[in-house]
Amino acid sequence: MPRRLTTKLRSSFASRVAHPKALLLAVCSFFIASNCFSSLSTSALPETKKTSIGRPSTIRVPATGFQSHLRSIPGLRVSPSLFPSTAVDESRPALEEDTEGRGDWFTFQRTYPSNSIPPDARLRAWNSRQRNQVANLAPQAAQTWRSVGPTATVSAWYPFWGLTSGRVNAIAVSPANSSLVLVGASTGGIWRSTNGGESFVPVSDDQVDLAVGSIAFSKSNPSIAYAGMGDTKFGYMGSGILKSTNEGKTWLRVSNSSLPSPGTIAKLEIDSSNPDRVYVAQYSTVAGNKVTSSGLYVSTDGGIKWKRTLAGAPRDVVIDPSDSKVLYAGLSRIEKDTDPDFGLYRSSDSGDTWTNLFSAQYDLARRRDFRVAISPANPRMIYTYFGGFVGSNLDARLRFSTDAGTTWTDRFLWTIDTAQLGYNTYLAADPQDPLTVYIGSRDLFKSTDGGGSWTNLTGNFYDSGAGFQYAPGGSATHTDQHALAFSPANPNEFYLGNDGGVSKTTDNGASFSSLNRTLTLSQFIGIALHPTNPAISYGGTQDNGTQIRSADSTWQEVLTGDGGHVVINPLDPSVVFMTYVRGDIFRVVNNGQSFELQVGSNATFGEFFQTPRIAFYPPFVGNGVDSTLYFGSWRLFISTNLGNSWFAPAGSLDLTKGVREVGSDVLSAIAVARSNRSVIYTGSVQGRAMRSTNGGQSWVDITAGLPDRSITSIAIDPTNPSIAYVSVSGFNTGHVYKTTNTGASWIDVSGSLPDIPASALLIDPSDPNTVYLGTDIGVFRSTTQGNDWRSFNRGMPPVVVHGFSANGSGVIQAATYGRGVYELGGPSDRPSIVSVDFNGKKRLTISGTGFGDSPKVIINGQDRSNRLSESSDTSAVLSGKTKKLGLKSGDNSVQIITSDDLSSNVFTITVIL
């Protein structure tokens, strides 16, 4: 049977096996954070970190375990107290990250119960939002969110990875200007660099969609670029095709309904001689039972109208560099009864018709990935890379042809790490050598003999003889590779996109530099703001761990892997509880700098099997008053002694809808009343709401009146536990419901809200009449207890908002899934750039507010403060020759940083010299 979402979800909340990147969390992350980086900010770090792993074959973890491995690194001192007793057994092979479980967690909420997303749902919601801008409200409503980073993150493996950011799916280098680089983030939009990646600025924040699947420049007219939207890596559905006619400076959505929604663009290609002829491989798994939006589509009018010429689920499409009429497409297979065979297809008539060159002869019912690359140096040399999809028995292989597809030879890939194929997957042919080919997996592998032998260029995993073992000490980049783009001017220079952002090599992969200093792409799951110090925050992110903010935009990764929810002990804020996925909870002391104890696991919560009923990112909260902790599986667990022990006050009572055909239901939201901690509300991913008035000992079902949708958040009035709000995900329903009688009845207070999934609620602690709602297109706010809503997104792009946190100083933070953390309130003297003027010769004037008398001026990521000729609180003037000012033709980024490390917005000035 085909593996649809409904069948996957039987295991979506089941723990596959804990990823070693997370199990190493305390082993390495806390050590590095507390011993190496406790006093560092990103401004004190090198602009880029160049890392070479030397001979990959020498990377080994001693049999005595990872502590010995850390001790073997020069300059590192290991304190035994920093290592938990549950540290990973390094003698075992590394197991796969649960990328599919993460994807199911994200997708199930949005598709339950129909297993589909309505066509153009996001676009309609966006248009509705535009009609309800907060500018229509009173003047005091015109507050502005500001980004507080991470820009970028001091990674747990900083000596090797450098600074990190969030997941990058696509990279394109201009064929006319090798310094012009575009990157597409998973859910963070398009970013542009004019200096080879030294600095980036976002350029698509005014568009409906920030999920990017593919980007390409036109070779015949490099002013034109296209972006295919959507994240095929279990992220977010796309809204079609964006187009730029000015080298990526600005973008417009051009595709009409002939490119059906929803879908994700896995690959986009442009005809080498005709910039109006565009091909896209659109891939979708949640467009209904028959996945009708998937297929290979062709446009001949610059991306407006589209025609599907090949049905199925394509993962890749490439154009023959010697003949633009010849195309190759790699097809996956989802629907066994209706999809074409999984395999390689060729078109000789510009994509009008297709012929199958070969099909895999095994396990066609499984979903698979399929990638294609053609050697620019010898277009008769074609490589394909295919196999299973994020699971066991991948059967990955490289199949190549030296005669343009007439005959084929298999290369088995037993010596390289192909784990997570379908998540971190690409194939690239060297522009000069037809025998050199690259495979992106968890690491980047290179072959110079047509796939006969391989070298690991990034070095996070090594072959232990019994599988690939995770040992990033000595590695060169973040794990999980998603994109590779060559520089047209230098064949030894190429860019990598991975789960940690962008890296670059200028020596053909011998070493890599991190290019993440100006990128803010982290995908946060939640946020916890220090109760008294608004400069300190904690948040869990997708594959960039749990991070601590200790300065304006400086964050440090202290818990590796996937970070979940965080709880700060209100009685002693130096004690923090951090989560990985499923049931793993860790107690950290010394303001997040020292690991103390693992206080939760699947077994802790009675889940002893490989398929525990615990959400991928389970609900985990405090009550804001004392140190009591609350954790949800399908039951509610409580700890009153800092996590040292847990109990289920209602015993084995199931607070969810139980085990059903669509999968095992689990808790997704918990809220405890501050004014009466005996009142507790819970919500489940399949829409069951429960309430207890005696501390969780007994429960009442309060689902009646709520829609059959995933409950994502619950907020209780701080002074009246009878008043509560519930947010729900999905479509074709209201998204905020309110009770005034402890759940006995519910009122739909969605009002003018667009029909878009909602994930987070916050009642303003200083004004219970004001409620904030985090949705998939940003923040909405009601100042009338939910009676009406207005878009409250000034300063924030249309990004998914997963969580809020607030403290008594009036600061509110929003955790976004793709653009880091945004803050409302905060220091009133924060600098802001209003305008920048360059006279074209020797003088640059920056105007704004809050500069102080000696601001630091950052131009294109470089400190140019020594060029200051005069400054005040409202202006800064730099004088000198153009070269000394650091300005060059094209876009330049300008930023002000005050003496107390407060930073302004990044201002872009275009210089024509």
Residue spans for each PLM region:
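Signal peptide processing junction and immediate N-terminal pro/mature segment
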Residues: C36-K50
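Bacterial N-terminal signal peptides
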Residues: A22-N35
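Aromatic sugar-binding surface patches on proteins
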Residues: S871-K881
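Surface-exposed, short loops/turns at beta-strand junctions within beta-sandwich domains
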Residues: T882-G890
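Beta-strand/beta-sandwich contexts
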Residues: P827-K856, R864, D891-S893, D901-L913
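Beta-propeller blade termini and top-face loops
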Residues: G54, T58-P827
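Solvent-exposed serine/threonine-rich low-complexity stretches and specific carbohydrate-binding patches
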Residues: Q862-D873
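N-terminal secretory signal peptides that target proteins for export/translocation
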Residues: M1-A18
